[in-house]
């Protein structure tokens, strides 16, 4: 049997042998341009994730929904209560609150029990406002007592009435601290000193009445202080000297307060004199003069 053999032996490439490279081919400019555009298109397509890709979809942020009142047209309406109160000044707010308390006594009682007690500085601030109004009403130049009185009558009466309302607030038993009571009385007496003096006696009754009321207030505080602490802090605080100066400036219209100081605190100096210590290091102190009854007497000067 004849077997036809090929003139060249058969050659089988090895499995791991790299394939032979084909000879290079020359490409036209048109072919290269079209392939470049196709590659760019492929890149653009790959940059966009397909809808069916398993990539995580971006979370869509929900916008806050606006409260829309369906079926209600925009129309004017009054301010809410908090906004309305913001527009009121102190005077207007006080007037509104006072009107409500007068119409509803139970609300007024609740306000009085809930509001904090006024301090001395707070009371003096209010009294200072009344005092400023009084000073602004005083006419310039030399005016007659009658004209001046009717110019200042309204603010004068308002200030005197305010003094009459504030003074009991700082007296015992409402005020338990003697120092607070004396501090208020000291400043209140100074305010009374600054009230206008009129030539006619018929126009002086406001100031005279204020002196009488403040004198009785001094006497009450001095008496209660003597009961609690024996009056030592009155003497140590030199309130006897303060009161004596007020009495002198008022023209002796604080006589009731001066008598209370002598009767309630005078025994301190008497006891100290009995032990040979003296009521004060200064024999000419006002307290010693009050005790000895020599206050206001002429003082001798020179070697007599």
UniProtKB/Swiss-Prot annotation:
Bias-annotated ranges (Polar residues): 46-63
Keyword Cytoplasm appears in the UniProt entry: yes
Subcellular location: Cytoplasm; Nucleus
Keyword field: Cytoplasm, Nucleus, Protein transport, Transport
Pfam families: Cut8
GO cellular component: cytoplasm; nuclear membrane
Zinc-finger recorded as keyword: no
Domain of life: Eukaryota
Example of a GO biological process term: proteasome localization
Subunit organization: Binds the proteasome.
Stated family: Belongs to the cut8/STS1 family.
Annotated protein name in UniProt: Tethering factor for nuclear proteasome STS1
Gene source species: Sordaria macrospora (strain ATCC MYA-333 / DSM 997 / K(L3346) / K-hell)
């Amino acid at each position: 049997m004849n077997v036809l053999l090929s003139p060249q032996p058969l050659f089988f490439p090895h499995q791991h042998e790299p394939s032979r490279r084909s000879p290079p081919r020359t490409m036209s400019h048109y072919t290269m341009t079209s392939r470049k555009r196709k590659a760019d298109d492929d890149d653009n397509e790959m940059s966009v994730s397909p809808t069916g890709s398993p990539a995580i979809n971006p979370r869509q942020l929900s916008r806050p929904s606006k409260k829309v009142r369906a079926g209600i047209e925009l129309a004017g309406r009054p301010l809410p209560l908090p906004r309305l109160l913001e527009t009121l000044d102190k005077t207007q707010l006080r007037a509104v609150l006072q009107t409500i308390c007068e119409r509803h006594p139970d609300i007024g009682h609740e306000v009085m029990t809930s509001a904090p007690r006024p301090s001395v500085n707070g009371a003096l601030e209010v009294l200072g406002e009344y005092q400023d109004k009084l000073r602004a009403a005083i006419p310039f130049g030399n005016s007659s007592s009658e004209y001046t009185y009717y110019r200042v009558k309204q603010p004068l009466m308002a200030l005197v009435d305010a003094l009459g309302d504030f003074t009991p607030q700082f007296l015992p038993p409402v005020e338990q601290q003697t120092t607070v009571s004396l501090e208020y009385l000291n400043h209140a007496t100074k305010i009374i000193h600054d009230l206008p003096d009129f030539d006619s006696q018929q126009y002086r009754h406001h100031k005279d009445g204020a002196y009488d009321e403040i004198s009785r207030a001094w006497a009450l505080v001095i008496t209660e202080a003597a009961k609690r602490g024996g009056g030592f802090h009155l003497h140590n605080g030199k309130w006897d000297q303060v009161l004596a100066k007020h009495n002198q400036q008022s023209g002796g219209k604080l006589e009731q307060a001066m008598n209370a100081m002598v009767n309630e605190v005078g025994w301190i100096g008497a006891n100290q004199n009995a032990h040979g210590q003296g009521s004060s290091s200064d024999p000419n102190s006002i307290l010693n003069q009050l005790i000895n009854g020599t206050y206001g007497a002429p003082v001798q000067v020179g070697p007599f």
